[in-house]
């Protein structure tokens, strides 16, 4: 799978909602229960995509893919928040029945979880983009809060993802025994740790040099009138 194909696949993951159908409502919202099952399918697709990304074993391509993917992910998250907020959809309320609202709900839940996966598997790369972006910080804080109230993450294998993500990002205080299991043991996702770390350092140096060159080009220039004095 080449770079363009992989990016296209990721965008399908970001934009394809899995809204549940059904109109019956009880104390256990049946539409939400249906969605939870579909969410499990979506999670398997997301984790497979990340496994394929890690197996590229090319930090330069990983940077490029994650750069595009994160921008797309937060754009979807921001648009979905706007839709849900405008319609006064409560995360702990009945599962929305309107198709547009169902898609927005799905996008928030799935992309927040997916971002958690990315953070835990590629923490250094994500911190490079995330730590200086206040808008992303506000969006993911909102996303985590929304997801925590939906009931989707109450039980099952995905229940720890929100807490681990929040601790890794510094959004919540780290527990005394906090460990990022994917950061410590990369054997499932990254075949060779040492070359990865070396390539990561090289890519970070290259990008810092690019940023410095851009800053120099953007620096103050002597106006024509000043040069004539």
Swiss-Prot record:
It comes from Homo sapiens (Human). A motif (Nuclear localization signal) lies at residues 206-213. This is Coiled-coil domain-containing protein 134. It is found in: Endoplasmic reticulum lumen; Secreted; Cytoplasm; Nucleus. Residues 196-218 form a coiled coil. GO terms for molecular function: protein-macromolecule adaptor activity. Changing residue 229 to A: Abolished retention in the endoplasmic reticulum leading to secretion. Glycans are attached at residue 148. Molecular adapter required to prevent protein hyperglycosylation of HSP90B1: during translation, associates with nascent HSP90B1 and the STT3A catalytic component of the OST-A complex and tethers them to a specialized translocon that forms a microenvironment for HSP90B1 folding. In the CCDC134-containing translocon, STT3A associates with the SRT pseudosubstrate motif of HSP90B1, preventing access to facultative glycosylation sites until folding is completed, preventing hyperglycosylation and subsequent degradation of HSP90B1. Expressed in cervical gland, cervical squamous epithelium, endometrium, stomach, kidney distal convoluted tubule, spermatogenic cells in testis, mammary gland, liver and striated muscle (at protein level). Also detected in placenta. Highest expression in testis relative to other tissues. Detected in T cells and dendritic cells; highly expressed in activated CD8(+) T cells, and also expressed at lower levels in CD4(+) T cells. GO terms for biological process: angiogenesis; embryonic hemopoiesis; embryonic liver development; placenta development; positive regulation of MyD88-dependent toll-like receptor signaling pathway; positive regulation of Wnt signaling pathway; regulation of ossification; regulation of protein glycosylation. The gene is CCDC134. Residues 1-22 form the signal peptide.
